[in-house]
Amino acid sequence: MNIHRKPEWLRKKINPAAHGAMDELLGELRLHTVCREARCPNITECFRERQATFLILGAECTRLCSFCNVTKGEPLPPDPDEPARVAQAVVRLSLAHVVITSPTRDDLPDGGAGHYVATVATIGRVAPATVVELLIPDFLGSRAALADVVAAAPRIIGHNVETVPRLYAIRAGADYGRSLAVLRTLRELAPGCATKSGLMLGLGETEEEVLAVMADLRRVDCTYLSLGQYLAPSRFHHPVREFVLPETFDRLKELAEKMGFRHVESGPYVRSSYHAAGYGGGTRTDQPVASGCLSDQEGVSAQ
């Protein structure tokens, strides 16, 4: 297959005119979205349906992952008014499900965990019925930071392993074992909270390696999985090594479901936040849940 030319199934059109109102609102509230910063191919579809993944803690990342289009540089301090603006957007868009993510902020003592907590709390005050999903960085493996995020009681917490261990050089500053440990710790701190992870395919991995990662994710009791095609944002980013066939995504979805993932999104255009509301709202039906991630018996203050 010619990897320099996208196949027919990967030629989704982006139409900026279709989401002018969404652009206007985000500009008014001075909010970033990963949809724009990462040049997501689903932006027209999601913005037209008034769905967005909000990017808090600025638009500059402290790591240099070779696959990512988020700006690298020296970030600004967290904006204390940002949580209120995100909450205002949730209300004005009448969102039933909102996804919050951020660049990696290794420059902050808590990695930005406190800003996540403030954002979840503010949304909870003004839109208590909205399901809040977080897609977090690894916080350098800090259990204290993870405990703070869990205590804020989002319904779903995601952390992407992104690729197979052999290719982790593309994730500057990241560690495969640490990412698995993050997901394991989230489950230990809040057994009733759904966890989620995702992989990009087409980076040069083998199917056997993908299946091994899926097995690792199940060993840390990861609830949800997303599998999508990697598309290089520019010629300066890590190149696409393969355009994975749609039927391969279908087969991997079937295998993942047999492994025990509660819900799987798998397809060329799938991204970790794509069709986020379809994952079931985040409550694990096999665990008692009183509020978000925390059940009546749980607490993290002593961790």
UniProtKB/Swiss-Prot annotation:
Its main location: cytoplasm. Its EC number is 2.8.1.8. [4Fe-4S] cluster 1 binds at residues 35, 40, 46, 273. Binds 2 [4Fe-4S] clusters per subunit. One cluster is coordinated with 3 cysteines and an exchangeable S-adenosyl-L-methionine. It is an enzyme of class 2 (transferase). Pathway: Protein modification; protein lipoylation via endogenous pathway; protein N(6)-(lipoyl)lysine from octanoyl-[acyl-carrier-protein]: step 2/2. It catalyses: [[Fe-S] cluster scaffold protein carrying a second [4Fe-4S](2+) cluster] + N(6)-octanoyl-L-lysyl-[protein] + 2 oxidized [2Fe-2S]-[ferredoxin] + 2 S-adenosyl-L-methionine + 4 H(+) = [[Fe-S] cluster scaffold protein] + N(6)-[(R)-dihydrolipoyl]-L-lysyl-[protein] + 4 Fe(3+) + 2 hydrogen sulfide + 2 5'-deoxyadenosine + 2 L-methionine + 2 reduced [2Fe-2S]-[ferredoxin]. It holds the Pfam family Radical_SAM. SUPFAM superfamilies: Radical SAM enzymes. GO terms for molecular function: 4 iron, 4 sulfur cluster binding; lipoate synthase activity; metal ion binding. Residues 47-262 form the Radical SAM core domain. One of its GO terms (cellular component) is cytoplasm. It is found in: Cytoplasm. Its cofactor is [4Fe-4S] cluster. InterPro entries: Aldolase_TIM (IPR013785), Elp3/MiaA/NifB-like_rSAM (IPR006638), Lipoyl_synth (IPR003698), rSAM (IPR007197). Keywords: 4Fe-4S, Cytoplasm, Iron, Iron-sulfur, Metal-binding, S-adenosyl-L-methionine, Transferase. [4Fe-4S] cluster 2 binds at residues 61, 65, 68. NCBIfam families: lipA (TIGR00510), PRK05481.1 (NF004019), PRK12928.1 (NF009544). Belongs to the radical SAM superfamily. Lipoyl synthase family. This is Lipoyl synthase. The gene is lipA.
